[in-house]
Design a protein with these regions (language model features):
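Acyl-CoA/ACP chain-elongation machinery
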Residues: 147-149
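Short Pro/Gly-enriched beta-strand edge/turn motifs at strand-loop
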Residues: 2-7, 54, 58, 170-179
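Alpha-helical support elements that line or immediately flank enzyme active sites
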Residues: 1, 51-70, 96-132, 137-145, ...
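Glycine-rich loop/linker segments at domain edges
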Residues: 16-111
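Acidic, glycine-rich active-site loops and adjacent beta-strand->loop/helix elements
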Residues: 2-12, 38-42, 133-137, 181-183
Length: 191
């Protein structure tokens, strides 16, 4: 068993990231497209570049720097762009200490979902549930992601109910909700 001290000596810190997101809506407020641009240090590029898969135009990319961008929300046309942060790569060796890519990717995504709900003047829980349709690719597959987006939607419903979502709050307080899944879509964890 590795202690936290051993872990800190063995691994490198997760890179900071900068993310830019945009969402398109039709005249009825339905989501028709989404872009997510993620600039971060690329651990695989620094440590083992020969393991990087090829993306568009045969350009290599580090999937560990954008894990989580292939989320369970139905957003129409979906574009994800991974940008290697050369400054981060040259300044320190980016790694996975204190979480892998979904740690920062899903934080940005969930914050953005709140912003989109606010723009549409929709309740953030209702907006999430509207996008977690479990249709097509978001239906999930056996044996790893059975239920897909419907399982994540169920987590949102249960969390909102247990938190008293929509109820009266004391003055000067607020309530937020975010959801996520494991490192990859085929992991069986929804939180």
């Amino acid at each position: 068993v590795m202690t936290r001290e051993d872990d800190v000596k063995f691994d490198s810190v997760r890179s900071p990231s900068v993310q830019k997101m945009r969402m398109a809506f039709d005249k009825d407020g339905n989501v028709t497209g989404m872009e997510q641009h993620v600039a971060a240090g690329w651990p695989t590029e620094v440590m083992a570049p020969y393991f990087m898969p090829k993306g568009e135009k045969d350009a290599p990319f580090d999937p560990f720097a954008i894990n989580g961008a292939n989320h369970w929300y139905t957003v129409g046309a979906h574009k994800v762009r991974a940008i290697s942060n050369d400054l981060a790569n040259a300044t320190f060796r980016p790694g996975w200490l204190r979480s892998v890519g979904p740690g920062f990717t899903n934080w940005a995504l969930e914050s953005f979902i709140d912003e989109a709900a606010h723009k549409l003047k929709m309740d953030p829980v209702a907006f999430r549930l509207k996008l977690l349709t479990a249709e097509g690719a978001n239906a999930g597959t056996a044996p790893n992601s059975v239920g897909g987006a419907s399982r994540q939607a169920n987590v949102v419903k249960i969390a909102a109910e247990k938190a008293g979502w929509g109820g009266q709050l004391p003055a000067g307080t607020g309530l937020g909700l975010a959801t996520s899944f494991g490192q990859e879509r085929d992991m069986t964890t929804w939180v």
